[in-house]
Amino acid sequence: MQSKRGRPRDEGTHKAILSAAYDLLLEKGFDAVTVDKIAERAKVSKATIYKWWSNKAAVIMDSFLSTATDRLPVPDTGSSVQDIVTHATNLARFLTSREGTVIKELIGAGQLDEKLAEEYRTRFFQPRRLQAKGLLEKGIQKGELRENLDIEVSIDLIYGPIFYRLLITGDEVNDSYVRDLVMNAFKGVQATSATESM
């Protein structure tokens, strides 16, 4: 479902299509967006869109990812714990913004479209997970976290509740909640020296 490869493209037209798709998504929601509407907004033909994308979900996914990448840099504060707090906070802020709520629509649509679900898993969630994994691995290397830390479980403990609130309970996900979440998750996984220094 990713953009089709091997076809030269005009970057201005490509950007116009992605901008049109994203604007329509924010205005009308995933279900109401069509390739026809994207083409009309971008002032291009449907054939131009289909040269580069296989369907509307592929266009929307690319438009969403370009925004997410810009909004979610990998932090480097000098402290592994603070890096994770910042990373998780930035993610929560993005997901609760109007732009970020798009992922909830994509998740919903993905329940009936396995190809779309695979797209957002591999192109949005897995890269964020790899970022978190890298931050935790750095903490172990620096001696701030226990050497025997189960990284995969730690990621689930930190990030899972954010999505649980967003998708299931609807409870608020603010900066204070995310910080408390991370600090509680880190209890017991910090190296002794790091714990004593806090």
Curated annotation (Swiss-Prot):
Keywords: DNA-binding, Repressor, Transcription, Transcription regulation. Residues 34-53 bind DNA. Residues 11-71 form the HTH tetR-type domain. The keyword S-adenosyl-L-methionine does not apply. GO terms for molecular function: DNA-binding transcription factor activity; transcription cis-regulatory region binding. InterPro entries: Homeodomain-like_sf, HTH-type_TetR-like_transc_reg, HTH_TetR, Tet_transcr_reg_TetR-rel_C_sf, TetR_C. It comes from the Bacteria. GO terms for biological process: regulation of DNA-templated transcription. It holds the Pfam family TetR_N. Signal peptide: none annotated. This is Uncharacterized HTH-type transcriptional regulator YdeS. It comes from Bacillus subtilis (strain 168). The gene is ydeS.
